[in-house]
Amino acid sequence: MTLLKTIFSWMPALVIAFLVMGCGGSGSSRQASAVLVDELGIAIQGFDPVAYHLVGKAVQGKAEYATQWNAATWWFFSKVNRQLFITSPEKYAPAYGGWCAYGIADGYAAETDPINAWTIHQGQLYLNWNAQVSTDWNADKAGYLKKSEPKWSTVQKQLQEGEATVHWH
């Protein structure tokens, strides 16, 4: 009977611990890779990376116009956009594998909001955590890029080895 009392006395603490481990932050069981993908391996939540450059807004891609590149599936709004990407993926794919540019500058990977937190700077697509972070990043692009460029190779290696600090929405 004493053993049962002990087990039940610890039960609330164990339940709370499991709940805390499963909520947000870097405690997520979601896998991280050098390219930010969803659970199905789709990059930038299925948004067409070429459309940001051509029409200046986030446009949802279609599975029927998908291609594989850099261990990720990329969706496009049209065959034309898919072909442009296939011809020059580095030109259209987001910097830092689609991870948050602001986070990379601080040495960690963070999920991004491809609808409200994106910028084209000097021909390169950058994504950020949310609209406010994107506004902050845009206020000092040069400063953040100076910090993030040398850190990306380290974060990228950590992502590939499963050792990166990752922040999920």
Predicted regions and their residues:
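C-terminal motif of bacterial Sec signal peptides marking the signal peptidase cleavage site
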Residues: 20-22
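Hydrophobic helical h-region of N-terminal Sec-dependent signal peptides
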Residues: 12-16
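Charged, low-complexity intrinsically disordered segments
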Residues: 24-169
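Bacterial N-terminal signal peptides that target proteins for export
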Residues: 2-11
